[in-house]
């Protein structure tokens, strides 16, 4: 099976390469906290030899409640991202929600992300693709993995083949998500790098009435399962104190657990990618 390589700075992202980490926090809560989180990730990933891209949102436009915290907004968010890039010399990934945000975000971010809920919005997809920036496409909770080929085609038609697919769980009844491990293999057949967003796959959407619940206690088991497939990368959110995080705290890893967690993921990835392929078709 052929696999494309997406290049971000000095990082090669591909299903047959050592895994890349898209890691950070769910939403920018403050400049100081963002710098603290980025510094922790940089120290751990450098120690373990894991290629790293910082991630966070400047606006959470799809919160459950009108009263929920959304973020600092586009302008302040981009200023924080620029400072993180300067300070730590790392690439940045962030998501957008409207077509007019694509170009200004692409001028700062190294990867722009298509949110799962918006992944079929053609105008948004086309605007992101036309920037020429690599695009991380989140698989919607309501889409089958086979359907992701249509979103890839929209990006390709707009002239962009620097594309990444990202699994983040599928709706399973009300207030629940599950991960179909067979979906990774289906999406890998399209030839693009495939990531696993283990954090959001642990969500229980609307599970706390006015916000999403989560199952942080199962993050290690689920991440191990995904990494055993042999993926281009892992998408992870961590927080110094998840219980007071302003968004998706119930899913976030404790920042203090980052090193032992990533050490396990790297060991598993290294082992899996040493195995020869067995064609059972």
From Swiss-Prot:
Is the keyword Metal-binding assigned to this protein? no
What NCBIfam families does the database record attribute to this sequence?
KDO8P_synth, PRK05198.1, PRK12457.1
The pathway noted for it is:
Carbohydrate biosynthesis; 3-deoxy-D-manno-octulosonate biosynthesis; 3-deoxy-D-manno-octulosonate from D-ribulose 5-phosphate: step 2/3; Bacterial outer membrane biogenesis; lipopolysaccharide biosynthesis
Q: Which organism is it from?
A: Hahella chejuensis (strain KCTC 2396)
- Classify the source by domain of life: Bacteria
Which GO CC annotations does the UniProt entry carry? Answer: cytoplasm
Per its record, the protein catalyses: D-arabinose 5-phosphate + phosphoenolpyruvate + H2O = 3-deoxy-alpha-D-manno-2-octulosonate-8-phosphate + phosphate
InterPro entries, per this entry?
Aldolase_TIM, DAHP1/KDSA, KDO8P_synthase
* PANTHER family in alphabetical order: PHOSPHO-2-DEHYDRO-3-DEOXYHEPTONATE ALDOLASE
Key words of the record: Cytoplasm, Lipopolysaccharide biosynthesis, Transferase
Q: Name one Pfam family in it.
A: DAHP_synth_1
Q: Which family does it belong to?
A: Belongs to the KdsA family.
**Molecular functions per Gene Ontology:** 3-deoxy-8-phosphooctulonate synthase activity
List localization entries. Cytoplasm
- What's the Enzyme Commission number for this chain? 2.5.1.55
UniProt record, GO biological process: keto-3-deoxy-D-manno-octulosonic acid biosynthetic process
Main localization, broad class: cytoplasm
Q: What is this protein called?
A: 2-dehydro-3-deoxyphosphooctonate aldolase
Instruction: Write the gene name.
Output: kdsA
**Taxonomy of the source species:** Bacteria, Pseudomonadati, Pseudomonadota, Gammaproteobacteria, Oceanospirillales
């Amino acid at each position: 099976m052929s696999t494309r390589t997406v290049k971000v700075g000095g990082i090669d992202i591909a299903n047959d390469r050592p895994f890349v980490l898209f890691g950070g926090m769910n939403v920018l809560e403050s400049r100081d906290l963002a710098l603290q989180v980025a510094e922790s990730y940089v120290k751990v990933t450098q120690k373990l030899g894991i290629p790293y891209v910082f991630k966070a949102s400047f606006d959470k436009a799809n919160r459950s409640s009108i009263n929920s915290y959304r973020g600092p907004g586009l302008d302040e968010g981009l200023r924080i991202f620029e400072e993180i890039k300067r300070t730590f010399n790392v690439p940045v990934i962030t998501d957008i929600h409207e077509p007019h945000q694509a170009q200004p975000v692409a001028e700062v971010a190294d990867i722009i992300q298509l949110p799962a809920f918006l992944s079929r919005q053609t105008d948004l997809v086309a605007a992101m693709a036309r920037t020429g920036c690599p695009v991380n496409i989140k698989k919607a909770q309501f889409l089958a993995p086979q359907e992701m080929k249509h979103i890839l085609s929209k990006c390709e038609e707009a002239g962009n083949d620097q594309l990444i697919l990202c699994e983040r769980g599928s709706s399973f009844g009300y207030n629940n998500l599950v991960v179909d491990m067979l979906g990774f293999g289906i999406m890998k057949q399209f030839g693009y790098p495939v990531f696993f967003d283990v954090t959001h796959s642990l969500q229980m959407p609307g599970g706390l009435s006015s916000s999403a619940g989560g199952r942080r206690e199962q993050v290690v088991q689920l991440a191990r399962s995904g990494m055993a497939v042999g993926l281009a990368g892992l998408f992870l959110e961590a927080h110094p104190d998840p219980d007071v995080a302003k968004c998706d705290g119930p899913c976030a890893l404790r920042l203090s657990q980052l090193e032992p967690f990533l050490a396990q993921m790297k060991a598993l990835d290294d082992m899996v990618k040493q195995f020869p392929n067995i064609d059972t078709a």
